[in-house]
Amino acid sequence: MNIILLGPPGAGKGTQASRLVENRGMVQLSTGDMLRAAVKAETPVGLKAKAIMESGGLVSDEIVSGIIGEALDALSPETGVIFDGYPRTQAQAHSLDDLLDARGRTLDHVIELAVDEDALVERITGRFTCAACGEGYHDSFKRPKADGVCDKCGGTEFKRRADDNEETVRTRMAEYRAKTAPILPIYEARGIVSRVDGMADMDDVSAAIAAILDR
């Protein structure tokens, strides 16, 4: 089974994909994770992507499609795939068709996580992680039990992603509406699109996605 999770950055795509990996043995192909790995390794692609990502822009179709193609080639044909954060444009949607067709795969479901923009801004700008172990926290929803001390490892240093700010979030929302939303008619014409309330409790979102995949 091959599925796409759609929604603006911060809608919870990564969380839901991780649960599908754990519960269904699928493989998550997250362009965000793959690009951040390239940025950390300071590869030529990573350096180019870094400036674009931190300004809230979207990296080129050529870069992203190349990363996805290589990832698919590394998997067995029977392995189910979750596309997290891809495709983001009509051009990428058509590229994905070509990538799947060339490997004998078909796209089974497209699930959109719908969100409220103001609530999403609060969700994203408030998040931070332990610098030592990576445990995630939030200013409003999940603060450390002891202020300034990580619950998991006891670390006292925390960090926020450079692009977790309101201006960048709203820029990405505008780009999502302008560039990503228009790809939905492509998949709606195939009858494979479902929508889930991305602002609901994570467990409720997971249950809704499971119901879609099992029907």
Indicate where each model-derived feature is located:
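Glycine-rich phosphate-binding loop of ATP-dependent small-molecule kinases
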Residues: M1-R215
